[in-house]
Amino acid sequence: MIQQESRLDVADNTGAREVMCIKVLGGSRRRFATVGDVIVCSVKSVIPGSEVKKKAVVRAVIVRVKQPTRRPDGSYIRFDSNAVVLVDKDRNPRGTRIFGAVARELRENNFMKIVSLANEVV
C-alpha cells in the first residue's frame, strides 16, 4: 500500500531513480494506492542528463508493491520493492523500456502498453 510521502523506485528508462508520492488519484479522501493505481509524484533523484528533472511533478502508475496483494483465485503476490512507471496524462508510458517484473493487475486496468514493454508479467 502506497500513501503520501511514500518513496518508490522508478522501473523505466526516463532517467528518474526515485520518486515520492504526493497524491493518490481517484477520490477526495482516498488514502492508499496499490498495483495499477495512478499517483502524483515528485522526482527526488535522477540520473545526470535525463529528460526528467529533479523536483518535477509527474504522474506514475504503480507496478510493484511490497504489501501482499490477494488475487481472486486466493493466491497472494508480493514483490521485493515498491516501483512505478512514469506516465503522461493519457496514461501512456514516458519511457521506452521497463525494468523488472510487473503485476498482472495492470492488464485488467488497461495499461497494455506497459504490459507489452515489460519483460516479465507475474
From Swiss-Prot:
Disulfide bonds: none annotated. Transmembrane segments: none annotated. GO terms for biological process: translation. PROSITE patterns: RIBOSOMAL_L14. Signal peptide: none annotated. GO terms for cellular component: cytosolic large ribosomal subunit. Belongs to the universal ribosomal protein uL14 family. Part of the 50S ribosomal subunit. Forms a cluster with proteins L3 and L19. In the 70S ribosome, L14 and L19 interact and together make contacts with the 16S rRNA in bridges B5 and B8. This is Large ribosomal subunit protein uL14. It comes from Rhodopirellula baltica (strain DSM 10527 / NCIMB 13988 / SH1).
